[in-house]
Amino acid sequence: MSRNEALFEASQKVIPGGVNSPVRAFRSVGGTPVFFSRARGSRVWDADGREYIDYVGSWGPAILGHAHPGTVKAVQDAAANGLSFGAPSEAELTIATRITELLPSVEKVRLVSSGTEATMSAIRLARGFTGRSKFIKFEGCYHGHADFLLVKAGSGALTFGNPTSAGVPPEVAAQTIVLDYNDVAGLERTFAEIGDEIACIIVEPFAGNMNLVKPSAEFMAAMRRLCDEHGALLIFDEVMTGFRVDLGCAQKLLGIRPDLTTLGKVIGGGMPVGAFGGRADVMDALAPVGPVYQAGTLSGNPVAVAAGLATLASVSEPGFYPALAARTEKLVKGLTAAAREAGVTFCADSVGGMFGLYFAAEPPASFAEVMRCDKEKFNRFFHAMLDHGVYLAPSAFEAGFVSAAHSDADIDATVAAAREVFRTL
């Protein structure tokens, strides 16, 4: 029995399913999950000492690569001054100011400790500000595990082939309107029927939890227009895309200004963190100045804030994002060419440092199209690449990530491995 297998067997006795987040269990792809012992740069090492080129990057935060020296030093320095205050700090002001400088749509911002906290707080705020209860989300999009968001969820929920969750009361789910991603006609019909009951739309501007799915310009424009016409708020869930695709996030690339934005992952540099912000008049509805309550013991944690500030400083360097996008495009083009040579139906797409791999002729534009991709072929591809020392997301429903630490040699080695694997599929 390998060390990975022994750890998984032991973990299942004391941790539900042996993991602390469902997608890590490899239920989608089969087999034993990999237990990591350390990570540095573009590489991770498992409990058996095997080394992998990592394209998961802790599900997005590791944009600089693992254990980046500047981030590690910032964490060490902050920790030496106290792990948590439970009180305001100057560092909170510094990171909040930096976020508002980088995102014109964010006039005020509040820090929390996770992406789920950010999205559920943003929706509560939208409901409180508008006085309405219903909100729109899109099938396959994942916005955390709050009850009212686990309706046609993406990410790990899709891994089980069951896009909802037990334990979500029907009366809670009834307030969640689920539409198809990129379906402009469906949006217009819904607003025509109940527009005055809708508090907000929440959307992943580039969906990354049903693999990478890009929005059409018409879809983006329709959401902004319909929210304006009916007094609803538009929330961009940029927990994944925030500072991952551009220094101005997805909203800059798409040219759409949301009313509220949720952030996480990159702004914590690998530490647990989240944030939500937007229009000042909306944000001022939050306690202690407004009637919408939100709180958190570890919100604005000084160690997480230090890691975030160090990361934002690095990604703000001139040329960072063009270089990251070029590296990601090189990977995508190399994999596509390797599949073509082998006669495998496959395509790939990317935006910034995010990418999607699809065993289909064209990149999907909706959840339904994602579900038509060849999942079994992906599973075989995943395990074969793992055997070749390449760690991809263990699910056909997840985007992948390239970091600044990935070298041309890493990309070349990955494409070479894929070339061998595609020939066996």
UniProtKB/Swiss-Prot annotation:
Q: Which UniProt keywords are listed?
A: Cytoplasm, Isomerase, Porphyrin biosynthesis, Pyridoxal phosphate
Q: How does it assemble?
A: Homodimer.
The principal localisation class reads cytoplasm
Q: Which gene encodes it?
A: hemL
Species, as recorded: Thiobacillus denitrificans (strain ATCC 25259 / T1)
> What name does the UniProt record give this protein?
Glutamate-1-semialdehyde 2,1-aminomutase
The record's subcellular locations are: Cytoplasm
The protein's annotated pathway: Porphyrin-containing compound metabolism; protoporphyrin-IX biosynthesis; 5-aminolevulinate from L-glutamyl-tRNA(Glu): step 2/2
InterPro entries on file: 4pyrrol_synth_GluAld_NH2Trfase, Aminotrans_3, Aminotrans_3_PPA_site, PyrdxlP-dep_Trfase, PyrdxlP-dep_Trfase_major, PyrdxlP-dep_Trfase_small
Q: List the PANTHER family.
A: GLUTAMATE-1-SEMIALDEHYDE 2,1-AMINOMUTASE (PTHR43713), GLUTAMATE-1-SEMIALDEHYDE 2,1-AMINOMUTASE 1, CHLOROPLASTIC-RELATED (PTHR43713:SF3)
The cofactor(s) it depends on are: pyridoxal 5'-phosphate
Modification sites for N6-(pyridoxal phosphate)lysine: 265
Catalytic reaction equation(s):
(S)-4-amino-5-oxopentanoate = 5-aminolevulinate
Enzyme Commission designation: 5.4.3.8
The reply on keyword Amino-acid biosynthesis is no
Q: Which GO terms describe its cellular component?
A: cytoplasm
